[in-house]
Each structure stands twice: as structure tokens, then as C-alpha cells.
């Protein structure tokens, strides 16, 4: 067994171990219903369970008036029987898993349904506030915290809900368990006598229990934790041959698609440029920048936050005021601070996990060179397989990567390009090349010498960079060049970002000279900035309209907040078929996540939608041909839809793209509080084209495919030139 095959075996084993930890964690918390195999059980039994509940309700409410069963009265108040069935299924699975009595399981089901009804009422009475709260708690799966937050906001808003009695919860729960046993048969009631006492438990049937035991140990259900390779990946020679070395990881294809027919079609077209691009990236040998790793680990250990590296420890409990027991104001203040603390810790949990994964993976590969496996999506865009630790990752992930085989800097031209890399990571990417080169010779050189002399003493300086960790890596490398002079072998990657690629492609497709200049397709010395131009146009529009429209007046009063940073994402969305609603959501998300103060609610749809329309209008004023091209692409998609055909095309790199969106009957069941959902696919084998989705997606996918073709051809040319 080679070192690489051993590594791939461990990737697989770690994926299995992770799944086992998740299962054991759910079992210990009493939430086995959140496991992958439990979701399979729910999907299998939900439809007959829904039908049985509906039949019970129909019988109860059919015929002569009279006293209805408590369960029927309570369940009749729910609009969606699917939700009743889903919640019951989860409660019963958790009850059987924990060996609860029928009474305990029934009360749990009743309690969960009561919460569903309570929060449905909250949504009906104040949908805007409910939506904000649910979005706020969306990044944590801690059920008690989610419920407490929702309950707290209901109390603060003065909502009153008549709680179910314990008797009502029990009757509803027992009836639903009875229906589930009759209609689905995965569970049963088992009576156990102990002395003079008799208890009835909810249990899985023997067939179900045997199946669960097999699923808990099912290695095929686990997802490997993909990592870099210590041996060069196998070159791609077809869409199914290449990448990892061992068979158990060879399910990773050159193109991320489960459609084997599509793989065959692509292979027949012989996409040589795609294979060359994938292999060129896979053949790139990397090594860990151990100096950056040591500093990052030191910051992590000492609790110093820099850029995307956050504090290793969650925020501690807020100290209680000395008069908390006697002073209501102090008590309220402390509770508010604790809510904010819990919120921040919940938001930081995933970021903290990513930091740990980055540092651990970098430490693991710190002593030898490594490679990354690559694959493409159906539009041809290329990605690294290995999770968050790759050269496309965040600032820290990129800074930890450097070339294992460097290149000597032998003249001023090469030195200038390295200087431009430093200026970019410092935050000068929109300045001209001449300005960036001049900066590197003056301020950049001084910063590199100072920071490299003692990086940890000057954290307060390099942490101010736009990309602090990459800037630190640059300072270390540039200082070596200054110390050693020409002939120094640099391993620092020089990253060059495209200037709004989407609009570049629209400029090329429409032969729009004006737009081409604004996205730097013209050979001008001065760097243009489309985002800055759109920002200026938006402010101009708001000023002109502020005399006659209240919303324009509101926004113009805050025009200093309409910055390049704020405008960037909404503008980027437009060439990829971004609609007004989506652009308005991007505006909302920006201001909600910022500390900027507005004189209206940041969630105000009217204000956000209005600014989105102004942004669209401004882009159209700058480049009216963009709308023409998008409409033309939409017309093409509609023609295919009328003939019930998928759209396919060949990109300039000879890559075959096939857009496949089919109609199928699917229902997604969502609850008001709980994080899990389930999709029910009733007719998954239909081949009827989803005309609406095909039309909406075509322009974006077409532009993405041109982006990808550019990468394929550029890497092919680079490979050919050595």
C-alpha cells in the first residue's frame, strides 16, 4: 500500500467515523429522527400516514353534528396534514429510540404540534417579525435555543396563545401514534409488566430495528472527507477516468453529474481543453507556508482575531449586575446582553469549525508537498474537490498555500508583478498597475521589511489589509526578495481577478465598445471600475428623482452609504439573470449585516425594492445592450421549451454543455420551528422539461460556460508555452 492509497483509505474511514459520531450524537441527544436513515424512514412512510390522518379527520367531521373527539378538533385547526404527519413521525422515532412509554411519546408529539400551532399564529399575526426571527436563528440547530428565542420574541411583541392542556396533548399524541401503527407499521406498542406495574412502550418493530442497525453501520451512506493528495492525482483521460488513486474514491468524476448518458455524450465530443485544464491544475504541486501557519496557530491559541480567523473561544457569560435580584432594569439589561451573546456564539460556531479544519489540515500536510484533485460542473467551471482547504478558499486558506516549485525573479518586470500582488491584497486592486507598482516600491517595501522582521509584533498593521493573511504571506516573500536581490526564487502565488466577468462576456457578445472599456477589455492604461460608475449613476438618479419621489428622497439623504462595496453584489447579479426581487434581497442583506444606520427599517421591502430598480436602471443606462442580449437568450430558451427540449451547446473550448431541468411532483414539508425538512418526490422519472426554470437559468448558465471556456483555453495555452 502506497502513502497515497493509505491516505485515501483514511479519507473514507474519517467520513465513516464522522457519520458514526453524528449518529451517536443524535442518539445521545434523543434526536435520532435527524439522522439520514431516519429521513429515509419518514419519506417511505409519510404518504400512507398522511392519507390515514386525512381519513380520520374526514370521518370525524362527516355526518350529523355532535361532540367531536378532542384529537379531531385539535388536528382540524392545522391547514396542512403533511406537517402533522411529519412532526408525529419525528416524535415517534425519537420516542422509540429513547425507549419512552407511549404516554411520554404522545405528550412529546402533542407538545411539538402545540409549538407548530403557536408559531403559525405568530407568523400569521406578524409575518415580517416572524421571518426576521427565523432567519436570525437559521444558523443553529440547537432546538431549545431556537424555541426559547421564538417564545421570547412572542412575549416581547405581546402575543397571546392559549396553551394546550396536558390532557389534550396526550389525546392528540396517542391518536396519532395509533394511526401511525395501523397505517405505516414501523412501530408498535409493547406492554411490559414489572411487579404490580404495567407500562406500555413505543418500540420499533423487529423488521424496522434490524434495518436501522444495518443503516447505522452502512459504510456506503458515508461521505469521505476529501483532502489533498501526497502523490500527483491521476490525469483525467475521460470524464470517469482520473483523479483519486483508489477505487472507493473513483466515484468522483471529471464532471459533477450523476447522468451517465451525459458523461458518455461529453466524452464523445472529446473535450481536450477541459482535460488539459483539469490536469494542469492537478499537476500543480503545492506546499504549506509554515511561517504563516505558525503565526495563525499562535493567533488562534492566544485568542487574537485577524480577518477570517476568529477567536477560538465562544463569548463568556455576561457578568451579572450586583443588583440583578432587586433591580428590574439591571435584570432586563443582563438578559438582553445574554441574548446577544448567545446569538453571536451561534453565528460563530461554523466559522470556528472552519478555522479548526484549516489549521488542522495545514498542519497535517506541513512537511511534504501536496496536490489537489479537480472537477468541473456541467457548465465547465472548475473547482477543487478538497473542501474548504484549497487555493479557492478564504483568505487564510489561500495564504497557507504556496507553490512547491518556485520561479526565480530575475528582472524588474517580474519584481513588479510580485509587487502588484502585494498591492492587491493590501486593498489597491482597483488602482492602475502603475500606481500599484509605485506603491510596492515605496509604502509596500517599507511595510514588507517592517512586518517580516517580527510579524506577531505588527499584527495591528498587517491585519488592516483587505486580505490580511495573504498580505502577510506577501510581506514575508517580498522581504526575502529585497534581502536576496534578483535570482531569489519566489513561491508566492500572484492572483489576478477578472473585472466583472459577466459584463465582459456581454460586452463581447454585443460588441459594446463603451461597456468593453468599463470592464477593462480595452487596452487602456487607466483601470476602469464599472461598480464605481454604477454607484455614481445610482446617486445621480436618486438626486434627480428626490424632488418628486419620497423613496428617492429617503435614499438620497443616505447616499453616502451607497458605496462601491454596497453596490458590487447587486450589479454582479444582473448578467447572471438576477431579478429585481433578488437584487432587493442583496441590498437588504448588506444593510442588515452592516452597522450602517438608516432612518427606516432595514427590512423595508419598499425601500430595498426601489433601490434595486434604480440599480437596474443605472446599469441599463450604462449598457443598454445587456438587456437586449439577455432577452435574446431568454427567447432562445423559450423556443426550446415550446418543443419540450433541453438546451445544449458547445463552448469555445469545445466543451459540451447540457442544461437539464425536469418537472417532477415534489412537496417540501417545512415546520415553523424545526430545522429539518423533507422532500417527497412522487414522479421522479418524468422527462418533461421544466420550461420556466430552463428559461430563467439559461442566460446565467450560458455566461458561466463562457467563463469556464476562458479558463480552459487560458490553461491550455499556458501549458503549451511551458
What residue ranges belong to the model's regions?
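Non-catalytic nucleic-acid-binding interfaces of large nucleic-acid enzymes and RNP effectors
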Residues: 1-571, 575-708, 713, 717-721
